[in-house]
């Protein structure tokens, strides 16, 4: 089977990761002790992608849990999910990274990294045919961002031919823990551009807006935000976990979604959006699901897809529905909004349908868009970065950990390059006299950046 090793790192990564295991455990009929209590053979057909079958028909997650302080680990261990994980899958330090990327990447994180790699190797060796890794982390703190990107470098060195995906939570001033978030985020994105094959950008600002506007929650908690993330992660991984034809493994997903190597940052979306613990009272039609899924208000990244153009799109529909109707709805959306999709990539909207709906819903849809408007997210964080770096504010916290100040400049210019690449492909129009030359020029420039 094609196995995936899941790594969650830092406080945010561990909280979201724990929620992910809770949700997919429910979907596959795996209880908190790791025993199967499901009802459908489909639940077990591809169970080995995320679970290892241990002695006595116990299913153990292929997970590595990492943090530089013990707090989050202890709360997972003492939760009802605690006995699900293998005890030596927990790797933690005691000092914390103090929201400092350099501590996570160069000092505290570097001391712990070999222990983490030992667990990663052990998990990889227990696989028949490892397809790749997925890392869950945030970019605003110190551990998830600094140590998370260090771990990606190490995995890239040791497993250069395996796919590496990340679920990365972008920081936002609306849900902010710390003043140096822009530094941590830009330094991390610089690494994500080079080392990941696909990055699912989950944005606290967008999650906050969804809770506020769509779900009408007056004071959203991290629990509410994590609930939305777990719905999306469950949807994105559906075609990896259940039998299906499209995007059935990480490499196929990357091939369908990434037209140019550096442009691998996706905006996820989900429909229907429901608040934690509440049920949907009215069954949605396929047309309403499709409409909601493409709605900017359902997108989990704080940028407006209407201001950009879609290079590629993947849609995962779940529940009992007509595939023909799904195809018709997507075709009509593409026809009505043809200027939102680049015309020089034909057939750039891919659809998968899975019979098994998420728990508590009859039908649901998950959306993955590679849209040039994602540059807004990078522009926002890079402006905050530049405002502080111009005055060298807080830089001593980073240089005192042995980090070179030139890294700040490199990371900043890399993000600027990324933004201009997205802009370039947004501006290319097919059908004009020089359009093919435009595309070729843009491709050549993008390739130059890769080398």
UniProtKB/Swiss-Prot annotation:
Record note on modification: Some glutamate residues at the C-terminus are polyglycylated, resulting in polyglycine chains on the gamma-carboxyl group. Glycylation is mainly limited to tubulin incorporated into axonemes (cilia and flagella) whereas glutamylation is prevalent in neuronal cells, centrioles, axonemes, and the mitotic spindle. Both modifications can coexist on the same protein on adjacent residues, and lowering polyglycylation levels increases polyglutamylation, and reciprocally. Cilia and flagella glycylation is required for their stability and maintenance. Flagella glycylation controls sperm motility.
Any GO molecular function: metal ion binding
Residues binding Mg(2+), per UniProt: 69
Compartments where located: Cytoplasm, Cytoskeleton
Predominant place of localization: cytoplasm
Keyword Metal-binding assigned: yes
Region entry Disordered, spans: 430-451
SUPFAM superfamilies the UniProt entry points to: Tubulin C-terminal domain-like (SSF55307), Tubulin nucleotide-binding domain-like (SSF52490)
Modified residues (Phosphoserine): 172, 435
Entry-linked Gene3D superfamilies: Helix hairpin bin (1.10.287.600), Tubulin/FtsZ, C-terminal domain (3.30.1330.20), Tubulin/FtsZ, GTPase domain (3.40.50.1440)
Subunit structure: Dimer of alpha and beta chains. A typical microtubule is a hollow water-filled tube with an outer diameter of 25 nm and an inner diameter of 15 nM. Alpha-beta heterodimers associate head-to-tail to form protofilaments running lengthwise along the microtubule wall with the beta-tubulin subunit facing the microtubule plus end conferring a structural polarity. Microtubules usually have 13 protofilaments but different protofilament numbers can be found in some organisms and specialized cells. Interacts with RANBP10.
Protein name: Tubulin beta-1 chain
Name of the gene: Tubb1
């Amino acid at each position: 089977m094609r196995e995936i090793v899941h790594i969650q790192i830092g406080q945010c990564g561990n909280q979201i990761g724990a929620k992910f295991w809770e949700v997919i455990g429910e979907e596959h009929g795996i209880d908190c002790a790791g025993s199967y209590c499901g009802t459908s053979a489909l639940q077990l057909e591809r169970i080995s992608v995320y679970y290892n079958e241990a002695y006595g028909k116990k299913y153990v997650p292929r997970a590595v849990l990492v943090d530089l302080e013990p707090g989050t680990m202890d709360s997972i261990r003492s939760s009802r999910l605690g006995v699900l994980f293998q005890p030596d899958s927990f790797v933690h330090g005691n000092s914390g990274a103090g929201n400092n990327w350099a501590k996570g990447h160069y000092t505290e994180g570097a001391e712990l990294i070999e222990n983490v790699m030992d667990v990663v190797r052990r998990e990889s060796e227990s696989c028949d045919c490892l397809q790749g890794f997925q890392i869950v982390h945030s970019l605003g703190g110190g551990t998830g961002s600094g140590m998370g990107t260090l771990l990606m470098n190490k995995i890239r060195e040791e497993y250069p031919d395996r796919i590496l995906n990340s679920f990365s939570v972008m920081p936002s001033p609306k849900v902010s823990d710390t003043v140096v978030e822009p530094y941590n985020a830009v330094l991390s994105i610089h690494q994500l551009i080079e080392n990941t094959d696909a990055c699912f950008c989950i944005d606290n600002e967008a999650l906050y807006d969804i809770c506020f506007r769509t779900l009408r929650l007056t004071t959203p908690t991290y629990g509410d935000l994590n609930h939305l993330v777990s719905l999306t992660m469950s949807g994105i991984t559906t075609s990896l976990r259940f039998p299906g034809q499209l995007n059935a493994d990480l490499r196929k997903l990357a091939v369908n979604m990434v037209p140019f190597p550096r442009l691998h940052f996706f905006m996820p979306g989900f429909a229907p959006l429901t608040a934690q613990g509440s049920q949907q009272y009215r069954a949605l039609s396929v047309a309403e699901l499709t409409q909601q899924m493409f709605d900017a208000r359902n997108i989990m990244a704080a940028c407006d897809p209407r201001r950009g153009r879609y290079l590629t799109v993947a849609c995962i529909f779940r529940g009992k529905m007509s595939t023909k109707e799904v195809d018709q709805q997507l075709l009509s959306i593409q026809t009505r909004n043809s200027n939102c999709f680049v015309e020089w990539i034909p057939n750039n909207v891919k659809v998968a349908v899975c019979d098994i709906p998420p728990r508590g819903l009859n039908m649901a849809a998950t959306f993955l868009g590679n849209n040039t408007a994602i540059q807004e997210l990078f522009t926002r964080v890079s402006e905050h970065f530049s405002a502080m770096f111009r005055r060298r504010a807080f830089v001593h916290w980073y240089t005192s950990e042995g980090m070179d100040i030139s890294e700040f400049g490199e990371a900043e210019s890399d993000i600027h390059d990324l933004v201009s690449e997205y802009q370039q492909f947004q501006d290319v129009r097919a059908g004009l006299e020089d359009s093919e030359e435009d595309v070729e020029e843009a491709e050549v420039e993008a390739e130059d950046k890769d080398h």
